[in-house]
């Protein structure tokens, strides 16, 4: 007979606060805001529709209604402010907050929104009803109001030392608990230590006291919603479990939640004890039950998909039993999804930290191993060919022979008291009939350098071979000690000096002696008018003679080794030792 008048905003408000929404739909919310501004009585009708939605028993509908009211207060001006600060709307808020069946998160959201509206309406004294309602709600429910954030004070050295001591005590306690079941003498000590811990776990959890070390706490649960006001703070809602990482400030810890890392105040969270053995067994049993129902869920899905549409599900006993058995795992499945989703975020974040730490370590390692280049003075040495020796002395080349640098071969400086005479006859003279040119590494210099270009060497050059061979016994001096012939007779016979030993070519090796260039004779031709030079030639370099060499290379200890014998005619008889002087 008497029917309430239909409100034009009921459908729009119900659409924006639907219980099936997963989050606030701002498209629907803005549609309501536009409609309120377009109609004369839009503010009054919209608030009336909001009061109806606050009476809904679904917590999501109540939360969406509070968000819609806050959006109207921010976008629709003084008209909606007056309706929100009315007695009817504030009484609806107080009634919902005082209901014991109302969700705790809804109560906290009511207190938060009333505080925001009180600050928003503070400039107009006509809207004082909202401030009165807020003070009344805070007095009646002191546990709803979140505490004020503590100041960010730096951690002192004493706090760091205390944290380290607590960490060492926790490690010692865990080691003692693990070894409690082994020797009998340790049973009393372990039981006496674990008794206070069991009492602490049985006690109700509360806010983390100031001064508690993060080294002994692995996770905390949020008691209130926290909105960051500065960069680097972690946002969370009531009931979220935060993994503790480290202490940053005096009453601020650093933690991770859903892949995000930041700091949070200690008075907004409560300490969660580590799970006991019974809790771990209970979780494992719950997971086993969920995974045990996988086959039943697949079987139920197969039966429902293969049956015809005319099948009466209520009359099919098998489908009914499968549905009832699998329906019980739904809450457990949702809980496991949330648990492993958080673990996935934690492992992902741990992997990112490990990658960053590995890159930092590698960069520091490369920087420590890098050495600054040493400045080189003078001409750098060339690499040595042939067999490696103990080190080449000054004057010996350490690389392949350069054609443009004939002075790199070792030659001693001639004495200053000798006459300025050429060691080699002119190249225009033809060789004598008794002169032979031994093959091997002896090559003629392209141009005889001036005496001033010689560098004096006052030590015996070392061989570049592993096993150098001497060609003279103890009776004779070594040919490399003195490289000049003794003064000749008065007849003016030219005297010859053995050419300096040259470094083998780059492709020379001990296993391939035939590769030595044998195309050029190191001794120039002698004058025709002069008597023939000595037929005995200096011995070749050890290791360079091949099978075709006229003089075999042998060590002094070999059986076929023969000492030097002077010729018996045509040439004055000189002592071999004096011959090499």
Swiss-Prot record:
Compartment annotation: Endosome membrane
Membrane topology: Peripheral membrane protein
Highest taxon above the source species: Eukaryota
Compositional bias annotation for Polar residues: 464-476, 508-521
Pro residues: bias regions: 529-542
Residue span, UIM domain: 162-181
Region listing for Disordered, in residue ranges: 176-213, 368-581
UniProt keyword annotation of Ribosomal protein present: no
Pfam families assigned to the protein according to its UniProt record, in alphabetical order: GAT, SH3_1, VHS
An example Gene Ontology biological process: protein transport to vacuole involved in ubiquitin-dependent protein catabolic process via the multivesicular body sorting pathway
Primary location class: membrane
Assembly and interaction partners: Component of the ESCRT-0 complex composed of HSE1 and VPS27.
Similarity-based family: Belongs to the STAM family.
Protein name: Class E vacuolar protein-sorting machinery protein hse1
Organism expressing this protein natively: Emericella nidulans (strain FGSC A4 / ATCC 38163 / CBS 112.46 / NRRL 194 / M139)
